Amino acid sequence: MSLRSFASIALVLFAAAQAAPAQQSIPTIGQLDGAPFASGLVAAPTGGTVAWVLNARGVRNVWTADAAGGQARMITRFTDDEGQDITDLTFSRDSRILYFVRGGGPNRAGEVPNPTSDAAGAEQAVWRVGLDGSTVGRVAEGSQPTPSRTGLAFVRRGQVFWLADSATKQEAVPMFRARGAQGALRWSPDESRLAFSSNRGTHAFVGVYEPAARRITWLAPSTDTDGQAAWSPDGNRVAFIRTPYERHRMLFTPERSGEPWSILVGDARTGKASTAWTAAKGVGSVFREIVSDNQLQWCAGDRIVFPWERDGWPHLYSVSAAGGTASLLTPGDGEVEYVIATPDGRRILYNTNQGDIDRRHVRMVAVDGSAAPVSVTNGDGIEWNPVMTAGGTVVVTRSSARDPAQVARVSGERMVALAPSTIPADFPSAQLVVPRAVTFRAADGIVTHGQLFLPPDYITGARRPAVIFLHGGSRRQMLLGWNYSSYYHHAYAMNQALALRGAVVLQLNYRSGIGYGMAFREAIGYGATGGTEYRDLAAAGRWLAARPDVDPKRIALWGGSYGGYLTAMGLTRDPQLFSAGVDIHGVHDWNVGIATFLPDYNPLEDPAAAALAFKSSPLSTVKSWKAPVLVIHGDDDRNVRFIETQTLVAALRKQGVHVEQLVFPDEIHSFLRHASWQGAYTAALDFFARTIGTRP
């Protein structure tokens, strides 16, 4: 499409949008995406304090509260949208100090994120702050703070360092040195030993370091990948997960079965280990990691709790540390996430979508399976990241269709926000659209879920523009409310902005995403093996086009990462159906995308697979692309290489497609600065107003 013809169409659509019924005080994207995002909730080992990170329009700070009802307080004082993340909140053993990491991790060149292009550079460092708000300060360059009663262990550039007094300016010293990249530090209960993982690239070991003897003991080293160490309560044994090495393991391809993974229990003194449990062959033989600080929980009664999807759903199971048959703890269709043991080690808290497939609620179950799980939260909200204080109070992070993520205390059937004043006065909660769940069937019979947003001034039969949002991942799920991921928290605000500007908006949970079981997640032919998830997008587009309230000539796409891939697929595979797109850091050639995560990937080793990967990519059919597109990318993206967007833009230029660009120097994949999100979404809203006639 020529620039002149595109401009003419845009002018007509803009005029039509201006002639539409006026809607008073449409919230700005600044108001909608100005909702704060709470994350990283943790409970102190003693007392009733909880802590979390609050990102308020790019300004990140640590907050604490007495879970029993005390007033929440901000205990750090960062003031700018600097793009420096705060993660790894960790209490000291006496619960008086909070450690955290400020700044992102390095890329393969060793560069840490510097999204403001600060001439002085940036760093990733461990910080500490007293719970009374005193002694806020940098401790040392590094990450993964792991305090003991006598000092602080942490990781710097793949090695473990030690600081006896984190409150002074003394230099940290290497605790020990080992080949590879060390991480996942875990003190034994008596703090005499430190378990850690040692990643050697093709394999990984679990080691135990004994400071008094200055000795490393490797636990049954093998050619496989070991990790996820969990100490026994007596401090003599370490449980860990072993996943078998496979030479030609590929990414972005379905993996329904493989060589079974196992749980081993090792002697911390001798390094000898025995197998406590091994997955059965077939479904569940491939390890499926869940959202949790540790995949293994060594609990009371010498029971080890772990995730397994033997029946096609990620569930929790329990097995004796001595070995035996595993007991299913969480039966039913649905997935478990954010798993944590209660302080007494007798129960497990987790969130799940069982019984409410497009939301999350918290449940609790006994580690021995002696009783069925009990609901801790329910209703039309979304709850995740549960913790329990030493006094037994349960605290969660929660949201709903109209309320963004906040930390709340569970009080019977109610949830009480701990910091309600953090919601901005101009946040337009009452004006937000409540999405509804929808399903539709693709041409090959696969049923796909989504959430539909109808504009507040909706009139039956009045044809409107429509927009489909495509999440990234692809191991993600959009929900019936504000998402529990910061990336999709922003995306939900954008979808609300589009609906409030007159568009019918559909969030599509296409195959290969989470939430709907293993068979849906590991869909045959998805990704680099055929791109079958595009069938779900095609079905969604035709479903919208057939609706009496949608103008079939004004259906647009937007998405980031994997969602950018599907946006590009739609504009190449169905140019008559989709009329515009916003492609944010999208994958455009699977061979490039795979090599980003597997640097030694060689397409020549399997030419047929490489050819299929390219055939499954938008660039293979780019000559069919006709619609205008806005591409957005940060050039320090570590997940999708910047060259992916460069290659696409070059191809589209050659064939005269109208392309608009927005590039953020030094920004990474999930934008670190609020200004970047605002810039991206402001540009996207303007682009859609000019191409499909949404209100500006």
Regions found by a protein language model. Name each.
Residues 7-16:
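Bacterial N-terminal signal peptides
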Residues 30-61:
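Beta-strand-rich domains and repeat architectures in extracellular enzymes and scaffolds
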Residues 45-46, 93-94, 147-149, 189-190, ...:
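Residue-level detector of Asp-centered blade-edge/turn motifs that repeat once per structural unit
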Residues 50, 98, 152, 191-194, ...:
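Hydrophobic beta-strand positions that form the internal "hydrophobic ladder"
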Residues 53-63, 78-85, 101-127, 138-146, ...:
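A flexible loop/linker signature enriched in serine peptidases of the S9 family
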Residues 66-70, 130-134, 165-168, 210-214, ...:
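Short loop/turn segments that connect beta-strands within beta-propeller blades
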Residues 384-696:
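Serine-hydrolase catalytic core recognition
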